Structure formats: C-alpha cells, structure tokens
C-alpha cells in the first residue's frame, strides 16, 4: 500500500520529491564532493540512511525548540541577490569556474520564488503551529528507530563505515548546504529561512549521531 501511495504521489507531483527530502539532498552533496575530489562514490542508499539519522535528529530539535512568536517574519524572506550570493559562496570553492554554483542556483531560484509566493500559507501555518507540530511528531520517527533498522539489516551506522568514507568536514558541509542544491522544499530550507543557527544545529545532530 505504501509503495503504491508513493508512486501515486510522485506521479501527481511529476517529481521524486515526495520520497526524497533533506536526507537525499545531503547524500547528493556528498556525491558532488566525491566527484570533485575526485574519488569513487559511496553507496547512495546507505548515505541516505545515515543522513536520515542526522535529519530525524534535526526534526526532533525543531519540534522541541521552534516557537513562532520568536521569529521575525520579514527576515524569513531573503532577496534573490542574498540567496544567490549564498549559493555561490558555498559552491564556488569546489568549482572556481562557477558551473556547479550556476546549476545549483538555477534550481534554488525556483524554490525561493515559490517560498515568497506562498507566504500567506506559511503565516497561516504559524498560527496553527501547535496542531501541526503534534501531527508532524506522529509522522516523523525518532532517529533511534532508523538506527535499529540499520542495525537489524547489518548496515553501516556511521559515515566512517562507508567506502570510501567522507570526512567530518565534508559531512558538515553537506548537512549545512544541502538545502541549496535542489528546488524541493525540505526541513533544511525552512531552517535556513528561519535563520536557525546552523553550526549549533550541526553540533547537536552530530553529537546525537
């Protein structure tokens, strides 16, 4: 049933986004780093599973700490110039010619425009955040559930077990910059727009992982 529903969701959206979120974006950035190193790619599915440990931790922190009354709504809507500069600053070091940054920006620009266009929806969600948080908590499994599944199938449970293994700096970079590479909207994007302290969040999820 779940597989069928997933297929329907992808068909209706004309995209894989319903089954491909923040964790997939992290894996894609790790692949991008590997390609530019260059070195062989680690197994994508295993990278996604390990990234899920990070993102489910991030979800739990978000559920626990986010309070709409504490945000400045105007600051949640950066300009195109601001975000283009951020994308270019993130990816230009790995590709001085700018091709990677240009490709990332082409996708990201679509997402940024959509975020601005749906501001009223976000404001409505903020008003109903208590109910939304309760619903989302029931849908997002905690990281220890993912860990139990990985152990049950004898899968790697740490990035250091991947072959080849990314460095901690590369994982940190991927976690922080994954929202900048695709037009799908994930928790990572919301955290960027909320101006969440990414370094603090990284230390929290990395410590928990």
Which stretches of residues belong to each language-model region?
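Core active-site phosphate/anionic-ligand binding loop and the adjoining beta-turn-alpha structural block
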Residues: 1-63
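C-terminal charged capping/lid subdomain of soluble metabolic enzymes
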Residues: 66-209
């Amino acid at each position: 049933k779940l597989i069928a529903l997933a297929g329907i969701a992808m068909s209706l959206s004309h995209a894989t986004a319903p089954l491909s979120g923040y964790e997939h974006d992290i894996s894609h950035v790790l692949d991008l780093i590997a390609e530019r190193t260059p070195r062989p790619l680690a197994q994508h599915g295993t990278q996604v599973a390990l990234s899920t440990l990070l993102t489910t931790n991030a979800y739990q922190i978000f559920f626990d700490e986010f309070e709409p009354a504490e945000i400045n709504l105007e600051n949640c809507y950066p300009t195109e110039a601001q975000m283009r500069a951020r994308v270019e600053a993130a990816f230009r070091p790995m590709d001085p010619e700018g091709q990677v940054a240009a490709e990332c920006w082409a996708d990201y620009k679509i997402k940024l425009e959509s975020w601005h266009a749906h501001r009223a929806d976000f404001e409505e969600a903020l008003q109903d955040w208590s109910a939304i948080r309760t619903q989302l908590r029931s849908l997002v499994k905690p990281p220890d559930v993912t860990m139990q599944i990985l152990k049950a199938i004898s899968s790697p449970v740490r990035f250091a077990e991947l072959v080849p293994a990314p460095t901690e700096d590369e994982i940190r970079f991927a976690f922080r910059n994954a929202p900048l590479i695709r037009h799908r909207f994930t928790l990572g994007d919301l955290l960027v727009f909320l101006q969440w302290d990414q370094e603090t969040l990284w230390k929290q999820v990395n410590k928990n992982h």
